[in-house]
Amino acid sequence: MKVVNLKQAILQAWKERWSDYQWAINMKKFFPKGATWDILNLAEALLEQAMIGPSPNPLILSYLKYAISSQMVSYSSVLTAISKFDDFSRDLCVQALLDIMDMFCDRLSCHGKAEECIGLCRALLSALHWLLRCTAASAERLQEGLEAGSAVTGEKQLALCLQCLEKTLSSTKNRALLHIAKLEEASSWTAIEHCLLKLGEILANLSNPQLRSQAEHCGTLIRSIPTMLSVHSEQLHKTGFPTIHALILLEGTMNLTGEMQPLVEQLMMVKRMQHIPTPLFVLEIWKACFVGLIESPEGTQELKWTAFTYLKIPQVLVKLKKYFHGDKDFTEDVNCAFEFLLKLTPLLDKADQRCNCDCTNFLLQECNKQGLLSEASFASLVSKRTADRDPQLKSSENANIQPNPGLILRAEPTVTNILKTMDADHSKSPEGLLGVLGHMLSGKSLDLLLAAAAATGKLKSFARKFINLNEFTTHGSGESTKTASVRALLFDISFLMLCHVAQTYGSEVILSESSSGEEVPFFETWMQTCMPEEGKILNPDHPCFRPDSTKVESLVALLNNSSEMKLVQMKWHEACLSISAAILEILNAWENGVLAFESIQKITDNIKGKVCSLAVCAVAWLVAHVRMLGLDEREKSLQMIRQLAGPLYSENTLQFYNERVVIMNSILEHMCADVLQQTATQIKFPSTGVDTMPYWNLLPPKRPIKEVLTDIFAKVLEKGWVDSRSIHILDTLLHMGGVYWFCNNLIKELLKETRKEHTLRAVQLLYSIFCLDMQQVTLVLLGHILPGLLTDSSKWHSLMDPPGTALAKLAVWCALSSYSSHKGQASSRQKKRHREDIEDYISLFPVEDMQPSKLMRLLSSNEDDASILSSPTDRSMNSSLSASQLHTVNMRDPLNRVLANLFLLISSVLGSRTAGPHTQFVQWFMEECVDCLEQDSRGSILQFMPFTTVSELVKVSAMSSPKVVLAITDLSLPLGRQVAAKAIAAL
């Protein structure tokens, strides 16, 4: 039907003076069913006829108002029609249009299709642009009127415009619709921003303060539309944040060599999720560092903590600085954190007493050097600490003992110098290089240098240089006795250092990412196949322990007949590989009575008399051999280990022997620890006065590990923070019981908790404990434990508040952390996932879209959930279609599969006819997702949520807010915007 007929109908009504309801009845008679009034452009036609003269036609306007009230026309068609009027000089027409907008601008709605809802968003954007243009025109007229002395009309119209603007923008729902429209039509939004700037310039000269403040308020509301989702309130009432504390302790204790970026991202993630103010965030990092310094065991661990605090954490803060806007603000926050820290005098005094120095002063100097503090702040903080410091500490400081912080800070440049020295050609000045390495072995120099290298990310480079040196010394040709002894020493020192690094910092530091064509260096080969490590079982009959028999025979003869080991032309790597078979020959001879104990003593002296590496290789094989022997067969092998670890009975003739023996004994003690515990044997290693393995064998004997787990968690919860020892016990339990056992039992403990403040603390602590292996724990928690709780009605009671809220919070935190980091590198402390685990997830959540997963078959027992199992051939709005599918996320990844299936389960729970604690749990889960989100949900875990879930969620009263809808939908996708517009327009 043509518009001309519509126009004729309107004119006929006007001529015959029909009342509004009479007009509506006749209109429905004139126009048959089928075409809607919006398609016929009724609103536009009525406005066109009403606005022909200098003043609006009241009768035709009454028809339009009736059409709006009776929903003959949609709000979007009326707004679009209004925004086409641009003769702002006709005051009465403008006022009439503002009156019409005033009727409905704060109660817009649309219950039609998604396209119609998007149409409403666009129409509202056009109407906002029209209102701004109208306001600007009114303000200009007011200024002209002021100059001419007749300002009353202009002021009245401007007041009406601002009133309508304020009423439209005060509605959160309208701002949410405008947020969607802005993403749909970026050019229109740019026009609005230009209009806003122009309006600001005009209104700046306005004398009426009330109108000016009203205009400023409207401007603020418009400018807030693009950032609607980024406003979070920070927790200003809290002072302790155990998650940050535990994360720092975990990194400092177990992951000194880890890269900084993953730690920085994890800290920022926790800061965002828990809304921690920056000064308190930095303060918590410092507090954890000082606690670590105080409680770290003496020796290597103490040096590791010192390096972590003084070298790594300042660098971490430098990286964190980039996440904050404005350097000045961040330095003020760091200064504020130190101001708070200085009030914790007992903590700082205890650290000073432990480290034999003013720890805070060293830290302030380092932060000042890194540009984290201004000079004025630095001077002020130093003077405050000096004034507050316990005077007895200064007098009790031992001038003969150099404090660790000072030593570590001096060790850092030394590491760089050593790396440069190691780059030189080894063949030119081996004696000079030996001198450098000899100094490294004295006292605690080696551990200091390694800690400094680990904290600054140079340890891998350090190890690589020593592997190259070790490789260089394996062969000697045409050498003198002196050259041969230097070569032997360089081989020995590099070998011992590399073993020490592998045991202290993990073997992954040593391993290179060598390409398939390259030859693997000797030390790497030996370490991977022959070196005992915790949890690594070696086969004593492995081919690596069975080299060429002629080499073995000559080595046995050399050990048995010579008074001492020969050095010239000695191929040390071959000797190291042959020693295991030689030891087996010697053991057999001893057991069969061919050799006496005195001969064994002479042989063991020969083995360790010149080159300690041979003793290390011998014990490595003996440890593997002892495991395979019966109780009554072990004595001789253990006796031989004792001999190799004991003092030398003959004279040693090579340099740095005592220093090398100290490292050798530490290596042997680490190697033998597991087997000695399993065989209930004791071997006394020469003591250095320091516990070389402070965190080994912490589990109490003869107690079930579940008891140990619940006990340690109860203690940690009571205390409110995790200490280093507890971290190591929990790590041992995780590897002993497995991820499912560990996670399941800790979640059971959380669900037992009924005190609200305790559940929140438990969540913060559990999250940090789960960081021991966050990826694996998240897969278990979201893929097994939560589905089990949500699908079993007998367990629903455990999801009541407060433990249910706490579990929802924990699940979201784990999901967000794992998802944000799983594309990056896994932390070096996290064990690599086995292939079969991945297969488990594939079978639980199959790859093929057409094949419903085990989990979804389980859910489809609900009679009203069959739609979930429909095959996604209809891609327009299938019940399981989510943003992740439109972004083509890799669904072979176990975490992506688990998230997708969890959100399908959530959708199923919301759509089910049975409500209960599980429904409430889903609501808390979604609320936490919204609370933790960044500006938009693209790339977050919510992209796995089916689009259909949005309409189910808004039925839950707590979730029926426009901001929530914006937060949970992926607005970067047209389909996401349609879903959001439909849900918001229906609110």
From Swiss-Prot:
<dbReference type="GO" id="GO:0016567">
    <property type="term" value="P:protein ubiquitination"/>
</dbReference>
<feature type="short sequence motif" description="LXXLL motif 3">
    <location>
        <begin position="446"/>
        <end position="450"/>
    </location>
</feature>
<dbReference type="GO" id="GO:0046966">
    <property type="term" value="F:nuclear thyroid hormone receptor binding"/>
</dbReference>
<feature type="short sequence motif" description="LXXLL motif 4">
    <location>
        <begin position="555"/>
        <end position="559"/>
    </location>
</feature>
<feature type="short sequence motif" description="LXXLL motif 2">
    <location>
        <begin position="344"/>
        <end position="348"/>
    </location>
</feature>
<dbReference type="GO" id="GO:0005634">
    <property type="term" value="C:nucleus"/>
</dbReference>
<dbReference type="GO" id="GO:0070847">
    <property type="term" value="C:core mediator complex"/>
</dbReference>
<keyword id="KW-0677">Repeat</keyword>
<keyword id="KW-0539">Nucleus</keyword>
<dbReference type="GO" id="GO:0016592">
    <property type="term" value="C:mediator complex"/>
</dbReference>
<keyword id="KW-0805">Transcription regulation</keyword>
<dbReference type="GO" id="GO:0035019">
    <property type="term" value="P:somatic stem cell population maintenance"/>
</dbReference>
<dbReference type="GO" id="GO:0045893">
    <property type="term" value="P:positive regulation of DNA-templated transcription"/>
</dbReference>
<comment type="subunit">
    <text>Component of the Mediator complex, which is composed of MED1, MED4, MED6, MED7, MED8, MED9, MED10, MED11, MED12, MED13, MED13L, MED14, MED15, MED16, MED17, MED18, MED19, MED20, MED21, MED22, MED23, MED24, MED25, MED26, MED27, MED29, MED30, MED31, CCNC, CDK8 and CDC2L6/CDK11. The MED12, MED13, CCNC and CDK8 subunits form a distinct module termed the CDK8 module. Mediator containing the CDK8 module is less active than Mediator lacking this module in supporting transcriptional activation.</text>
</comment>
<dbReference type="GO" id="GO:0060261">
    <property type="term" value="P:positive regulation of transcription initiation by RNA polymerase II"/>
</dbReference>
<keyword id="KW-0804">Transcription</keyword>
<protein>
    <recommendedName>
        <fullName>Mediator of RNA polymerase II transcription subunit 24</fullName>
    </recommendedName>
</protein>
<feature type="short sequence motif" description="LXXLL motif 1">
    <location>
        <begin position="128"/>
        <end position="132"/>
    </location>
</feature>
<dbReference type="GO" id="GO:0000151">
    <property type="term" value="C:ubiquitin ligase complex"/>
</dbReference>
<dbReference type="GO" id="GO:0044877">
    <property type="term" value="F:protein-containing complex binding"/>
</dbReference>
<dbReference type="Pfam" id="PF11277">
    <property type="entry name" value="Med24_N"/>
</dbReference>
<dbReference type="GO" id="GO:0004402">
    <property type="term" value="F:histone acetyltransferase activity"/>
</dbReference>
<dbReference type="GO" id="GO:0003712">
    <property type="term" value="F:transcription coregulator activity"/>
</dbReference>
<keyword id="KW-0010">Activator</keyword>
<keyword id="KW-0597">Phosphoprotein</keyword>
<dbReference type="InterPro" id="IPR021429">
    <property type="entry name" value="Mediator_Med24"/>
</dbReference>
<feature type="modified residue" description="Phosphoserine">
    <location>
        <position position="860"/>
    </location>
</feature>
<feature type="modified residue" description="Phosphoserine">
    <location>
        <position position="871"/>
    </location>
</feature>
<comment type="similarity">
    <text>Belongs to the Mediator complex subunit 24 family.</text>
</comment>
<dbReference type="GO" id="GO:0003713">
    <property type="term" value="F:transcription coactivator activity"/>
</dbReference>
<feature type="short sequence motif" description="LXXLL motif 6">
    <location>
        <begin position="855"/>
        <end position="859"/>
    </location>
</feature>
<comment type="function">
    <text>Component of the Mediator complex, a coactivator involved in the regulated transcription of nearly all RNA polymerase II-dependent genes. Mediator functions as a bridge to convey information from gene-specific regulatory proteins to the basal RNA polymerase II transcription machinery. Mediator is recruited to promoters by direct interactions with regulatory proteins and serves as a scaffold for the assembly of a functional preinitiation complex with RNA polymerase II and the general transcription factors.</text>
</comment>
<dbReference type="GO" id="GO:0006366">
    <property type="term" value="P:transcription by RNA polymerase II"/>
</dbReference>
<feature type="short sequence motif" description="LXXLL motif 5">
    <location>
        <begin position="786"/>
        <end position="790"/>
    </location>
</feature>
